[in-house]
């Protein structure tokens, strides 16, 4: 197991997004713009980030 983490910041609103994108943002634990969460860096998290890459900013730690 790696201890790598990524910090995900929502930078754009979900207005006008598809249901899949809204569900992905909710699954990541984000609620509104400028909200941050820290998640483990694994393929599952990376896949979720790829779905909403235009709405979030990712920082690796």
Curated annotation (Swiss-Prot):
Record-annotated membrane-spanning stretches: none
SUPFAM superfamilies, sorted: Ribosomal protein L30p/L7e (SSF55129)
Superkingdom, natural source: Bacteria
InterPro entries, per database record: Ribo_uL30_ferredoxin-like_sf, Ribosomal_uL30_bac-type, Ribosomal_uL30_ferredoxin-like
GO CC field: cytosolic large ribosomal subunit
MF terms (GO), sorted A to Z: structural constituent of ribosome
Keywords: Ribonucleoprotein, Ribosomal protein
Signal peptide residue numbers: none
Assembly, per entry: Part of the 50S ribosomal subunit.
NCBIfam families: rpmD_bact
Family: Belongs to the universal ribosomal protein uL30 family.
Protein's name according to its UniProt entry: Large ribosomal subunit protein uL30
Source organism (scientific name): Chlorobium phaeobacteroides (strain BS1)
Protein encoded by which gene: rpmD
């Amino acid at each position: 197991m790696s201890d790598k983490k990524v910090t995900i910041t929502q930078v754009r609103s979900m207005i006008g997004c598809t249901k899949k994108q809204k569900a992905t943002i909710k699954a990541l634990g984000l609620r509104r713009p400028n909200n941050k969460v820290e998640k483990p860096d694994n393929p599952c998290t990376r896949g979720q980030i790829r779905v909403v890459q235009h709405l979030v900013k990712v920082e690796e730690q």
